[in-house]
Amino acid sequence: MAKVQLSPKEITLFRTALKCYETKQYKKGLKAIEPLLERHPEHGESLAIKGILLHSLGNTKEGYDNVRLGLRNDVGSGVCWHIFGLISRADKDYVQAAKCYINAHKLEKNNSSLLRDLALLQSQLRQYKALADTRNALLQDNPGVRANWSALAVAQFLRGEYASAYKIVDAFESTINQGVPVDTQEESEAMLFMNLVILKKDGVEDAYKHLLSIEKKVLDRVAFLETRAEYELYLSKMEEAKSTIYLLLDRNPDNHQYYYNLQRAYGYEDASGKVLDSAEWLNLYSQLAKRYPKSECPTRLPLEKLEGDEFLTHVDLYLRKKLKRGIPSVFVDVKSLYKDTKKCKVVEDLVSKYASSLSTTNKFSEDDDNSQIEIPTTLLWTYYFLAQHFDHVGELEKAEKYVDLAIDHTPTLVELFMTKARISKHKGELQTAMEIMDHARKLDLQDRFINGKCAKYMLRNDENELAAKTVSLFTRNEAVGGAVGDLADMQCLWYMLEDGKSFARQKKFALALKRFSTVFKIFDTWADDQFDFHFFAFRKGSLRTYLDLMSWEDSVYDDPSFREAAQGSIEIYFALFDLPFAKYSPKLPDFEKLSSGEINEEEEKKIYKKLKKDLSKRLERAEKLKEADKSRAKSEDGMPVKYDEDPLGENLVATSEPLKEAQKCLEKLLPYGDKNPSAYILAAQLYTRLKNFDTASKYLEQAKVILGQNDPTVISTEKFYNSIKTQSN
């Protein structure tokens, strides 16, 4: 097709529309482009501009149609390809966007902004080889900008080409040595990055020498000292390591790792953590306690390794000090010692004696002199400790006894009722636990933590509406979606997860999927948030932080909250596939009747009629909620009003392909299957339902390797697999 030639007036209209897009005046931009398209309805670039304006106004399908039509009419236009890339990028389709930018750059080789955007996409997609080529092209275009050198060096580092990364950083550093002005913060970060490159390229010894040579240039003293201490320990330069670690402790005497490293530097502990000289080791901590009197570490850390009478002596002093001061978190502090059952018993006997003596003599021990009389609250915190202790070890009757004694002593302390509620929860008394936690909440209505804890107990008791009403005391209830919508905006993972699990227990699958999908969106947002940093990090010179970010983002979905939401969703999709009536979200009694298969046809018809009626009511309610959200949503100039199209999740549960949806959830779990073998179990169950028995068998075998042949989930999945396979044959 011959390319349309625009008149000067038409070119002005085109530029006006483009300017309107850049300034977010989308409706005005459409008015500018329409007259041009009336005269030239097949002008590709104008169609593409119209498409991106419509897309920006929320008309996604029409926007894509116009862009694709424009591209078809003018496939040789870099503008059309660029616009297609922009809308693909806006919709998080980074693979398609990268292809579009590559095509656009082929047609506009002098457009460096295309290369910059392409580099961001390649970083997001972890296409490191292609990224290195793109960063190199940007460097050739503008070698005077430090960010271009840094970006190329990092790209080479990420693809494992450490020698190339070193050459690039070294080449730029040589220009600085010739008198080129430099930002000291950027230079400091570049030096530490270069040291990391040398470590990967040449090993610890060369990295240590380089680190010492750049000491005066490094502004991040903590990073410098930590790295130096690490190298000195590795190279067995123990005297130097001691000096370095003491400098770190002087800065932060509450960092546990510094103490562990100091033990190694003195030779009192090996790399595995085993104490080699207990007397000298204990003396070291005694000296450290005098040197850092405000830090708890020198008195707390020895408790991890001490045994027998020495442990008894030191834990006695430690607990007395904490209970005297009335520190509520003392049990949380010491419960890690309970991994050793002997230490657990020592602590139990010791604190039980405290309680007995304090209740009669106001002293920790009857052998203490009269100058050691304790204030009344010491007994309170001792009872509180014992309540938590016995709850932790599963002796719930004793736990309840001590928490009641504490409440009798001080009936207005919130923490006591929280512990009493937890004990009731562990006894399986969810209603009682919820009521006690609500009483605790009412003792301090200004405390957001106890409000959230109470809501959590309500959700565990399947009181969803009451929980939402409770958290609404601390949310913006005028937000779209009300209190729950505001919690979603605040990325409140725990609430969405607990709410979803509660709805799943009640077989309200639509709402359960809705909450789990909110969890997915939060994690997707975190994954997408890195996009801007692919540019920003190099502008600021934060190279090491950027590498940490990339490492964290690589495992962003390896998170317990995401795992629970994904597994919950997959199990619901399995139910939707296995039980067609599940899409109606029947109440538990009806769900059990229908799934039992023991009801007659007439009763089944009655239940289905009721389910359809309930569904109709829910759909009406969903429409009302959408209208309410529309009235609450504020429209920005030229921007579409944002509200939830599916507030109750009915669209999610109505899917015609539940196994396909389950597969989408599973794809993000499987990369971490070795750490989370339940992903392999779910995969085996999914592919069994799909009758892809070879794949199902593969995942079942992987689960067996990790969990063992006798694991209950392995056994049940294997039975399910064999049953379906037999039926298929």
UniProtKB/Swiss-Prot annotation:
Keywords: Coiled coil, Cytoplasm, Repeat, TPR repeat
Region Disordered: start-end pairs: 626-646
Repeat as UniProt keyword: yes
Basic and acidic residues bias spans: 626-645
Domain of life where this protein originates: Eukaryota
GO molecular function per UniProt: acetyltransferase activator activity
Localization per record: Cytoplasm
Chief localization: cytoplasm
Coiled coil: 599-635
Recorded GO CC terms: cytoplasm; NatA complex
Any Pfam family matching the protein: NatA_aux_su
SUPFAM superfamilies on file: TPR-like (SSF48452)
SMART domains recorded: TPR
Residue ranges of TPR repeats: 10-43, 45-77, 78-111, 146-182, 185-218, 380-413, 415-447, 493-526, 677-710
Name of the molecule in the record: N-terminal acetyltransferase A complex subunit nat1
Organism from which the protein derives: Schizosaccharomyces pombe (strain 972 / ATCC 24843)
Lineage summary: Eukaryota, Fungi, Dikarya, Ascomycota, Taphrinomycotina
Primary gene name: nat1
